[in-house]
Amino acid sequence: MSKLKDNPDNSLNDRLNREKAIELARVQIEKDFGKGSLIKMGESPVGKGIESISSGSILLDEAIGVGGYPRGRIIEIFGPESSGKTTLTLQAIAEVQKNGGIAAFIDAEHALDPAYAKALGVNIDELWISQPDTGEQALEIAEYLIRSGGVDLIVVDSVAALTPQAEIDGEMGDSQIGLQARLMSKALRKITGILSKSNTCIMFINQLRMKIGVMFGNPETTTGGNALKFYSSLRLEVRKIDQVTGSSADDIVGNKIRIKVVKNKVAPPFRKVELVIYFGKGISREASILDASVKYNLIQKTGSWYSMGDDKLGQGREHAVSYLVKEKEVTDELESKLRKIIFEDPNQDFLEVGTT
């Protein structure tokens, strides 16, 4: 090696010889496996940044790190019951449709409420929906949709409801250990390879279970084995932390939730964000923009008053949010400024940093 370093001509010749050898190998690889089987990373879509789907909240988009849910990836959203998991996915569907995209909802729980989806901005006339009978059926439908290349977002609700065919055919008391975990492992191995080529984003909603006999550490775990944890590029933990009251203490108008990015392969992980989900309305876009604007000093908060320059928006958070709801042009302008500040900062590096 030292001789090669001492002689630049030898080093250059060695480099050229190795490049010729790689080129011959590339030709053979493309002959056997098809064009594009081996390319330099700078020539591939992987090396050109990560496309994303907005979550509907600029605060959550910031926490994820790439402006929303990454395309061509597997995403897991998990948490306790009634914490807002389905609401997050429906808002993502609404954002996809708003931008002219196509979304599909695989309703394994058979519990999707069309009225609620419509209230969150989902165009139910354009939403593709499937209510499969078995887990195998659900995951095969997802695979077909991904292979089609025509769907931007697929939501599977939920992993816990993906019941294997053998379990359905068996008796109620039969022991079926590991069936669902094997089903998920096999399906995800197939799905992962084709996702990036189709640029489809697939979101799995998952539930929490308690591990029996755990004395130390967190006894909570998600259903469906470990495969989804490994294959997911993004895992979001959603928890309800408080209730939001209206005009009186008995008037509960929504829930305050905390979302933690527990795994992230497209940006730094472990970020947290708190959002408000209003009953029948979902996550308030205006409330997220207000909080982000205060954070980046586009809106000033003095005591309980919110102001923007010389203009007062209102006293108290709810009045300031109401102002932004009415003044759509102001809200759009604030969002545009925030996205430039957060996502177009040249100092931010969104290369893959996570590990499996």
Curated annotation (Swiss-Prot):
Does the entry annotate any disulfide bonds, and if so which pairs? Answer: none
Q: What does this protein do?
A: Can catalyze the hydrolysis of ATP in the presence of single-stranded DNA, the ATP-dependent uptake of single-stranded DNA by duplex DNA, and the ATP-dependent hybridization of homologous single-stranded DNAs. It interacts with LexA causing its activation and leading to its autocatalytic cleavage.
An example molecular function term from Gene Ontology annotations: damaged DNA binding
UniProt similarity note: Belongs to the RecA family.
Q: Indicate what this protein is called per its UniProt record.
A: Protein RecA
Keyword ATP-binding assigned: yes
Main subcellular location: cytoplasm
Please give an example of a GO cellular component term from this record: cytosol
Where along this sequence does the record place binding of ATP? G79, P80, E81, S82, S83, G84, K85, T86
Q: Does the keyword Nucleotide-binding apply?
A: yes
Query: Which Gene3D superfamilies does the record cross-reference, listed alphabetically?
Result: P-loop containing nucleotide triphosphate hydrolases
Name the PANTHER family for this protein: MITOCHONDRIAL DNA REPAIR PROTEIN RECA HOMOLOG-RELATED (PTHR45900:SF1), RECA (PTHR45900)
Give the keywords, sorted.
ATP-binding, Cytoplasm, DNA damage, DNA recombination, DNA repair, DNA-binding, Nucleotide-binding, SOS response
| One protein family per Pfam | RecA_C
- Which compartment or compartments is the protein found in? Cytoplasm
The record, for SMART domains, names: AAA (SM00382)
Annotated SUPFAM superfamilies: P-loop containing nucleoside triphosphate hydrolases, RecA protein, C-terminal domain
Question: Which GO BP terms sit in this record?
Answer: DNA recombination; DNA repair; SOS response
